[in-house]
Amino acid sequence: MAEILVKNARIDGAVTDVLLSGRTVSRIAPAIPAPPDAAVIDARGGVVIPGFVDCHSHIDKSHLMDGGRAKYVHGTGAVKGGLTRVEKAAFTVEDIYKRAEAVVKTAIASGTLFLRTNCDVDGYVGLKGIEALTALREKYKDDITIQIAAFAQEGVFQDDKTQGLLNDAMRMGADLVGGHTITFGEGERHIDFILDLAAKDGVEADFHLDESGNRENY
């Protein structure tokens, strides 16, 4: 098992050493002798903290303005949503993978160990995002834990495809199912579908609770 000794690390204000055995912190103490073949890093008094947790992201729709793509403008949510749908219809699995991978690499380099991302599942993008993100999750599984929420961004009952697609997304490896509390007037019907699907598959449900801007809706 590979070992790493971090010397002169600052934890809770005190300078100490940290010994890592594989992915586990095996010892924290001053002046730990370096085990044979251990890699030694001098933290030089830098702060050592647990890895970061990113509990809400949408990496399937990241970097949409890169490379001369969509030129988003200030406007209403409806306008921005319409622009996003135009983009989503043109997504490919490879395109989503490349853009999402850039986010994952940045997250790892910044000390993030856990990332939960929504992934749109609807009649515009289909299951392309799920295919891309499950492959990405597998590639980086030793560096970061990625949870994928099959997300009903465009509602559940706005077409005749989304309900089946959400079920298919769970079969393809989505970790949980996501929805809105207020989406296209679907109301409790939307919430009930998401909760029922989560219960059927024994997974968590992840809801956006703040989409309308009207406190009476809560």
PLM region spans:
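Active-site-proximal loop/turn and secondary-structure-junction residues that shape catalytic pockets
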Residues: V121-G123, A150-G155, T183, E211-G213
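Histidine-rich, glycine-flanked metal-binding segment
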Residues: M1-L5, R10-I49
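Divalent metal-coordination and catalytic microenvironments
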Residues: A9, R23, G45, H56, ...
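Divalent metal-binding segments
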Residues: T76-L127, T181-T183, R189
